[in-house]
């Protein structure tokens, strides 16, 4: 039976291997025709970036020094060779195959003609930025440690993604999924130093975010607040750029049941229940957004959601639970708290504040203010004084119903619409937020922020209080989150999750399509939307991050494979390039030998590991081949597309003698342990109804699930949570679902004939 809305948990993976290459001669995916027959430059310097060069990036507009180009993190390029008058001539230049089939979320860094990009597990690709020829590649799975283990993939909430590298002083810094931080020689890709950043490997920590550099430090956070029985306790670690020696560590939430070691943790502890359950670590991971102000020497941390989501379980007596869902400023020299602002006090909805932040100088109230801007998940746009943390303005940038406004102290006023303690509630925005990790962009010319907005509700369920058949889902704790589309049918899920809102209740709210993605041009001074363009609907969601340029252009990739180019001032669509690949990352722009290029990483996955590929997504139509795509004026008219996806028919499933009770128990166990990665349909992880690799044999199936037989491919062992009887019940459920799919396939074929 096809489910017409999705249960979102959060990945597994497919195997890939890359080899360090000493020579720059290797197969590049494809190349477009050149506008001129001029031999491209051969790079002569590698990673030659210091803080002064980064801070004065506008003197070198052809470089893209960091994830957001410069130290402001604005994802804005001063280049204008490609502009609103000639962008119709933008065409394909070259592509590089990453040999992956998962989400790719990084914006490449380009320095002196060399492109540095990261991929799944924390792999790094150094390429000639003109031709795409590989200079070297780095695979953390070949460096010892746990980088290739399935446990790291099992603990990753949202695929085995990586959001970027940092480049400084001839080194490329990257973190692997299992939490090791590497400093690589920018010329060769060989490790200069490495360090394990994880404090406790018995907890489900992973790392997917990019390192943040200060004057002399590399700062890295982690993830894991959604996983296991009690998640993890968030922190960031700062290491010496040259040696890798740890200089300080900042925790974001107090440790349960222990005396606190710092003034900021003592203050935070007062906002938590002193008798809280020590199994629950608290969460607050810094899994993505960070920023740095060199003049103030402050590191800004975007702190994430709670562990678990439900505050009644996490901190029964209530409280704001600092520093969850906060923007936190830390002194880069001492590692001590400078200030904090909490966006969602006592967060119950996975409304972390981990989204990327932008530093800007804005004319507000008759003077120029040094601000930090963020559009976090909760639906409010924040403009804060970045020296003091004082709010300057806070305004909703999308529809929300969890809050009915702000009080005089800029604290959100909670509405009863989002209290799911007494029954499931339809809540806006959904857990992916009004805006997730996909970068927004600030254009200093238009003074507009371009936000990839997600407009969707969620139905949030307290499983125990709703008398559900399951009381825990890995990746969601004691809650379940359903994201309804226009064909929402609650009867599909009632057997597992109990009573649910009826269809008419879901269709209230914004008055627009229930689930859609919108690109919005937001004026942070006037606090309003200037223009908006719907980019996707019918549940493709998760379109790409945004880049703006001095050519009056805004670039955004989409899940359906389109790379769209808009006029920055009006939002008029100027150019569409069909790539055949789902795009989640933000593009970059750079110039080499007088030619401007636009590059973007393409590969669908990430949080969509928790759902089948939407029917109108590129990943449902084409193979989800990971690529770096590069474009220039007078490039090729057609961008090569991946091969079409061809599904083999369901094979007759193996015979079994399972009882209805065993199958029903297997359905519950599958929902609790397997469903956040393995969906029935085309998805990132395999559809288990399509038996293969010997898993049609019960003994082999047990070895895969309990012993980690396929750990090298990303399928970790579950012996800590499942028994042999549990696995047999899961297999019975899968075989039963395979039998239904095989039967339905035959009936469709018979009807067609």
Where are these regions (language model features)?
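Extracytoplasmic beta-rich repeat domains
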Residues: 96-107, 137-166, 194-210, 226, ...
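Flexible coil segments in periplasmic/lumen-exposed cytochrome c-class electron-transfer proteins
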Residues: 644-664, 671-673, 680, 713-753
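Short, conserved, GDST-rich strand-edge loop motifs in beta-rich repeat architectures
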Residues: 220-234, 274, 301-321, 455-512, ...
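Gly/Gly-Pro-rich "capping" loops immediately C-terminal to redox-active cysteine motifs
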Residues: 667, 679-717
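Blade/loop signatures of beta-propeller domains
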Residues: 37-92, 256-265, 412-414, 507-509, ...
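C-terminal motif of bacterial Sec signal peptides marking the signal peptidase cleavage site
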Residues: 27-29
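Detector for the c-type heme attachment site
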Residues: 69, 386, 677-683, 706-707, ...
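Repeat-blade elements of multi-bladed beta-propeller folds
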Residues: 64-68, 103-123, 152-180, 206-228, ...
